[in-house]
Amino acid sequence: MSRFMHFYKSPVPLVLQAHKKNCLVYTNLRTRRLRLLAQLNQREKELKNQDFRVGHEKVINTIDEIRTFLVDNHDDIIESIDGVIRTLRDIRPNEQVSSSTTTGHNNTTGTPTQSVVSGTGAVTGTGGTSSVAPDANMVADKTVTITMADKPFEYRDSFRDEFIATMYNATLRSYTMGDWYSKLKQKIYDEERYRRRFKVTHPESPAISYELVCGQVQILDLVTVYPTTDIVITDIQSAICILWTLYNGILNTTLDLSVTFEEVFEKVPGMLDVLEAEIKKENGNTTLFGTYSFADNEDIVFYNPPKDKRYSPRTFENNVIVRLLYRLRCIQNMPNDPLGAAAQSNLGIGWDEDRLFRVCRKLLTGIVQDVPIFLHKQYYLRSGCTCISALLYVKCFLDSTSVFSPSDRKFSLDTFLPNANTYVDASDYRGRNIKNFSFLWKKYVTQLYKDRPSITFSGIFPGAVLFSIAYSVSNNWLGPGHVQRPHPNARTVKLQLLHNQPLYSYLWVQHRVPRHPLEVLKAHDRALFYFEYGIHLLLNQPISFTTHRNTLKRQFNVTDVYELCYFFVLGFVPVELII
């Protein structure tokens, strides 16, 4: 064996770390590259998120600016849209006249033109001779009359809106509308956004701006309009059905189902006379005293029960109208009476035997497809009874004095309508058989309903709603559940909350940006509760103008029944302010 190894054999085995240089260096570079790419992607995402947040904030700010602009310039925008609509209406008949004239001219060389009848006129031509009939699609002027001492008013779209516009366009002078509107102006002046929205300046001045009047009248119009989609008939329509059922029951006549809704609508003053006489007969005196409100729970928030369409037990138990319906057998049992409902079910009596449902099914044909059952969907029963109570109060109040009686009134249509020529003479005073409400119903209410069948009580008499709510507040009523009136001989004096202003709260949430529908519904229902209980309080007072004359004169510039008619219709009485 040789002591030396061959040259090609290494005497010491080489042991090297695997991939010591190349692969490890390559791995470090790859990891660093991946780390840098991840950081770059993360930074890119952060920049995108930052740009998104900035863009989102810009969009939100832009939306808020648009909302503020729309709220502040709502009336101007609506007026501009109405102006465009009126312009288009005026252009359309002119185009038809031009086309008709051109057609007649082209027919001069041909056969004689035929006779064309459309609407109330006709176009008859032979050869080149033609006479153009008025367009049947033209919107005719509508007329309403408020009192027997005035001329009729002509309007195109909305009587109240056009009356306000005419009043403020007539002169450059300002108008005052009583202490109530002055207090409202002072409250709004403290809010900068509403101050700009309603153009409120100089809070110490009693002058009321055009924007503030329109905003408040709009709120009054919405008090009895329930802002949910499940309401299919109005309070006026519900009241007409209940009134016709009571009218036939009081007179002990066979239920007349051969009439239409429009025919019954025109008979409302006579039906209210019969109802008034029946309530006075039941009371045994000449008053209408009774319970016209409803026994709600203290925790009630919404006027319309949201779940099962029923109110709590005994809500309708003491109401005068509902008890009269039950006494005359117009309804089979009292609402929410399980014993009566079970007894009727055991006897096999269905809804076809219910007189009120039969009347609703007949009168509401063509108005609504699915006629509601008032004892099930009790909102209609409650709103209808409240509307009847309100109509009864308005009728008795307006018929307490003649519009021709002399007074020291300051309101005059001649101030802004030079051709009004109001005829009021003391020699024409009639103390008996006063029919102010019947005249107003025929010349004003009926015309408004024909023009807009969806109108409600607050849209017809916003002033009555305003006075009712103000009367509830002045009597220290705190809302549903607090139904006890302060007794004159009580040992304690009941105080009221400082911010007990339901109409101002409703106005505030209605024009707030952004608007919260639930808060709007709560404020609306609170105002509706106050209106309902105010009617109850007013009907439990002697119904005459002298009873509330001082309050009406101080709060709303109403000095006699003539001005009261305009106050109920307009929601205000403007008196020219001379500085």
From Swiss-Prot:
As for subcellular location, the record says: Virion; Host nucleus
Q: Where is the composition biased (Low complexity)?
A: 101-121
From the UniProt entry, list the residue stretches annotated as the region Disordered.
92-134
Q: Where is this region: Interaction with major capsid protein/MCP?
A: 1-46
Zinc keyword on record = no
The UniProt entry's GO biological process terms, in alphabetical order, are: symbiont entry into host cell; viral genome packaging; viral penetration into host nucleus
Name the InterPro entries for this protein.
Herpes_UL25 (IPR002493)
Instruction: Kindly state which keywords UniProt assigns to this record, in alphabetical order.
Output: Capsid protein, Host nucleus, Host-virus interaction, Viral genome packaging, Viral penetration into host nucleus, Viral release from host cell, Virion, Virus entry into host cell
- Record has Secreted as a keyword: no
Q: Which domain of life is it from?
A: Viruses
GO CC list: host cell; host cell nucleus; viral capsid
| The family this protein is said to belong to | Belongs to the herpesviridae CVC2 protein family.
What this chain does, per the entry, is described as:
Capsid vertex-specific component that plays a role during viral DNA encapsidation, assuring correct genome cleavage and presumably stabilizing capsids that contain full-length viral genomes. Participates in the interaction between the capsid and the tegument through interaction with the large tegument protein/LTP.
Subunit architecture? Heterodimerizes with CVC1. Interacts with major capsid protein/MCP and triplex capsid protein 1/TRX1 at the pentamer vertices. Interacts with the large tegument protein/LTP.
From the Swiss-Prot or TrEMBL record, give the protein name. Answer: Capsid vertex component 2
Task: State the organism named in the record.
Answer: Elephantid herpesvirus 1 (isolate Asian elephant/Berlin/Kiba/1998)
